[in-house]
């Protein structure tokens, strides 16, 4: 049994990283590192987590299911298309019914508004496993990976190059929360959501973080400690081939990384499209830590699950 204190969270759900304080994020990361060293701890014995998927998944499904098993609980896969919700049952009714059967819900879907409604109407914790707007579990794992490499966030520069998508949104909020310097470089028209950038800038004023949204990839990666990218076409965007030409200057390759620190590390949330957003030379090279990063999804989510479940128990 763990001797490390389980972090107390002042939230029932995790829909975006706005809901966590800097202190809570750091505590979750430290707890995740502990769980990484002590995989089999039955901290959620007998608990059931419902896993609702409307989008394809490898890392999210396997890491949540494996995490629940390692914690002594059970992950129950629920296909959104096969549930009554896929045939017109309301999100509200679904939330209330599932609250009678299971102990928590993880949902990976398109509409962030649906996840917000699910959380509002359920009496059990709801975790956002990905929406079109946010990917908080990925960002937690990313912060954990950076922290393992540097043991600090102060003075660390993270450069995100590519599409200003859901991953970028969560990284902006994450970087702002922990006081990190984050630069984003996207083509014109593919910047991150303006409202989310405003939120990140407001948080940064309180934490001392530095947030920049640019269009020059060389300027963005200048002296960066970490370079991060994602696919140019997210699920549901296939067929927008004109993006390839527009995004080509934003490819992470050996020329671009010369502007970063020599000791930079490469991050990618995966799946990757080699020779599109990143060359094989970079993602398979010695400075890439993408598979360690993917592995940390398991540990960060385990820490989150235990903390949310325990915090809700104490509040009830």
Swiss-Prot record:
Keywords, alphabetical: Amino-acid biosynthesis, Arginine biosynthesis, Cytoplasm, Transferase
EC top class named in words: transferase
Keyword set includes Phosphoprotein: no
GO CC annotation terms, alphabetical: cytoplasm
Residues given in the record as carbamoyl phosphate binding sites: 57-60, 84, 108, 135-138, 269-270, 297
Reaction catalysed by this enzyme: carbamoyl phosphate + L-ornithine = L-citrulline + phosphate + H(+)
Major localisation: cytoplasm
EC assignment: 2.1.3.3
Pfam families the record matches: OTCace, OTCace_N
UniProt entry tagged with the keyword RNA-binding: no
Molecular functions (GO terms): amino acid binding; ornithine carbamoyltransferase activity
Pathway(s) served: Amino-acid biosynthesis; L-arginine biosynthesis; L-arginine from L-ornithine and carbamoyl phosphate: step 1/3
InterPro entries from the UniProt entry: Asp/Orn_carbamoyltranf_P-bd, Asp/Orn_carbamoylTrfase, Asp/Orn_carbamoylTrfase_sf, Asp_carbamoyltransf_Asp/Orn-bd, Orn/put_carbamltrans, OTCase_ArgI
Residues annotated to bind L-ornithine: 166, 230, 234-235
Location in or out of the cell: Cytoplasm
GO biological processes: arginine biosynthetic process via ornithine; citrulline biosynthetic process; L-arginine biosynthetic process
Family the entry assigns: Belongs to the aspartate/ornithine carbamoyltransferase superfamily. OTCase family.
Functional description taken from the UniProt entry: Reversibly catalyzes the transfer of the carbamoyl group from carbamoyl phosphate (CP) to the N(epsilon) atom of ornithine (ORN) to produce L-citrulline.
Name used for this protein in its record: Ornithine carbamoyltransferase
Organism of derivation: Bacillus thuringiensis subsp. konkukian (strain 97-27)
Organism phylogeny: Bacteria, Bacillati, Bacillota, Bacilli, Bacillales
């Amino acid at each position: 049994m763990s001797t490390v204190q389980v972090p107390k969270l002042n939230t029932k759900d995790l829909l975006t990283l706005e809901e966590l304080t800097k202190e809570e994020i750091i505590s979750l990361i430290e707890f995740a590192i502990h769980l990484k060293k002590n995989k089999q701890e039955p901290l959620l014995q007998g608990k059931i987590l419902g896993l609702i998927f409307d989008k394809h998944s490898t890392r999210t499904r396997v890491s949540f299911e494996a995490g629940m098993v390692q914690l002594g609980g059970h992950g129950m896969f629920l296909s959104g298309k096969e549930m009554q919700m896929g045939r017109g049952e309301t999100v509200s009714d679904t939330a209330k019914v599932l609250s009678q059967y299971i102990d928590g819900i993880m949902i990976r879907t398109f509409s962030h508004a649906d996840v917000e409604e699910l959380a509002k109407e359920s009496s059990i914790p709801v975790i956002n496993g990905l929406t079109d707007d946010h990917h908080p579990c990925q960002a937690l794992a990313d912060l954990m990976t950076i922290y393992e490499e540097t043991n600090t966030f102060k003075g660390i520069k993270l450069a995100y190059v590519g599409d200003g998508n859901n991953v970028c949104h969560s990284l902006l909020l994450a970087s702002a929360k922990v006081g990190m310097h984050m630069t984003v470089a996207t083509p014109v028209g593919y910047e991150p959501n303006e409202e989310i950038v405003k939120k990140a800038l407001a948080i940064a004023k309180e934490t001392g973080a530095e947030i920049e949204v640019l269009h020059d990839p060389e300027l963005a990666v200048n002296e960066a400690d970490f370079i991060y990218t994602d696919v140019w076409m997210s699920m549901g965007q296939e067929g927008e081939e004109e993006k390839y030409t527009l995004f080509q200057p934003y490819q992470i390759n050996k020329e671009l990384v010369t502007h970063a620190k020599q000791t930079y590390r490469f991050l990618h949330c995966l799946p990757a499209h080699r020779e599109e957003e990143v060359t094989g030379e970079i993602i398979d090279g010695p400075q890439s830590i993408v598979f360690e990063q993917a592995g940390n999804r398991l540990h960060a989510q385990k820490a989150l699950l235990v903390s949310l479940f325990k915090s809700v128990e104490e509040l009830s």
